[in-house]
UniProtKB/Swiss-Prot annotation:
Keywords: Protease inhibitor, Serine protease inhibitor. It comes from Swinepox virus (strain Kasza) (SWPV). One of its GO terms (cellular component) is extracellular space. SMART domains: SERPIN. This is Probable serine proteinase inhibitor 1. Belongs to the serpin family. Poxviruses subfamily. It holds the Pfam family Serpin. One of its GO terms (molecular function) is serine-type endopeptidase inhibitor activity.
């Protein structure tokens, strides 16, 4: 969330994968010890749902003399290269590897390598899964999506009416909804409010936990825009805002990499398999129907309901 708050300052749409970044950080060690946390449980997960690609490229002239990577811990995720030569070959190898690992959804993550590079962490993440309850394409209509109180664009707005976990925080005038994917292990959460900047100013991990604690099952009339977002970041300057105490053993020091590049893609549309909602209907409050219309900029996050990992976090300023 620290990284997300930093990225919120950027204009336009954003998406990034906290779990992918964490996986890369897990592979870095210091000269006095090594950072060790179990590798991501998603590296071999169903590729139709989530694919994460992470690799470290280390300079052979530097790391052989002064190693800062535990090669035994990461195996083929580490590649020795000569950053003083063959930049094009290294770039081609990186992009080819990422493309293969993400089923060709991400074909280019890097187009140049800076001078004096000694260590380059590359990761890419792609997520696509079917909704548990599909959005019927025939119900999608062109509606207004408001940038602000005076400017709007016309976008395809998906709609559905079904049983969803929904919460309303009265003092902040915030609505939040959970939209589960087909196996219910993963869900997209969307908090919205009338004034988007208000949400940006108050959002924290604790607030998200508090908001989700208010959620109950209701019949909800939901409308969200169809969107596809692709984002790419150089995280070396942002990485300083991460709370490294989560990653680092006592007495170790983190060696800042020369480059830390991250790219994520997420696509949200009507597609999905139809699944039974009968298990929810029996506990739904059918008397109090709710509305959830995302007609203006919003934040979203995809969460693993089993591990509580944040797989993807982002904001939508313009769905088109």
């Amino acid at each position: 969330m620290d990284v997300f708050l930093k990225l919120l300052q950027k204009d336009g749409n954003i998406v990034y994968s906290p779990v992918s970044i964490s996986l890369s950080i897990d592979m870095i060690i210091s000269k006095k010890g090594y950072i060790h946390r179990p590798l991501s449980p998603y590296t071999n997960y169903n590729e139709d749902t989530i694919s994460i690609a992470s690799r470290i490229y280390g300079d052979c002239n530097s790391l052989n003399k002064d190693p800062c990577i535990c090669m035994d811990c990461i195996g083929d995720m580490f590649v020795l290269v000569d950053f003083d030569k063959n930049h094009k070959d290294i770039i081609d190898d990186i992009n080819k590897w990422v493309s293969e690992r993400t089923n060709n959804h991400i074909d280019t993550i890097i187009d140049n390598i800076g001078d004096n590079t000694k260590l380059l962490i590359v990761n890419a993440a792609y997520f696509k899964s079917s909704w548990e309850d599909e959005f019927i394409k025939e119900y999608t209509s062109i509606e207004k999506f408001w940038y602000n109180s005076t400017e709007f664009i016309l976008v395809p707005m998906m709609s559905n009416k079904d049983i969803y976990s929904y919460g309303y925080i009265k003092d902040s005038d915030i609505k939040i909804i959970e939209i589960p994917y087909k196996d219910r292990r993963f869900s997209m959460f969307i908090p919205i409010t009338k004034v988007y900047k208000t949400l940006c100013n108050i959002i924290t991990i604790d607030k998200l936990a508090m908001w989700t604690s208010t959620m109950n099952l209701y019949e909800v009339d939901i409308k969200i825009p169809r969107f596809k977002v692709e984002s790419s970041y150089e995280l070396k300057d942002i990485i300083g805002c991460i709370n490294m105490e989560y990653y680092i053993r006592e007495g170790t020091e983190l060696n800042t990499p020369s480059g830390f590049r991250h790219k994520s893609v997420i696509e949200v549309n009507e597609d999905g398999t139809t699944a039974s909602a009968s298990t929810c209907c029996c506990v739904a409050d059918s008397v109090s129907n709710k509305e959830f219309y995302a007609y203006s900029p919003f934040i979203f996050y995809i969460k693993d309901n089993t591990t509580s990992d944040f797989l993807f976090v982002g904001k939508i300023i313009s769905p088109m």
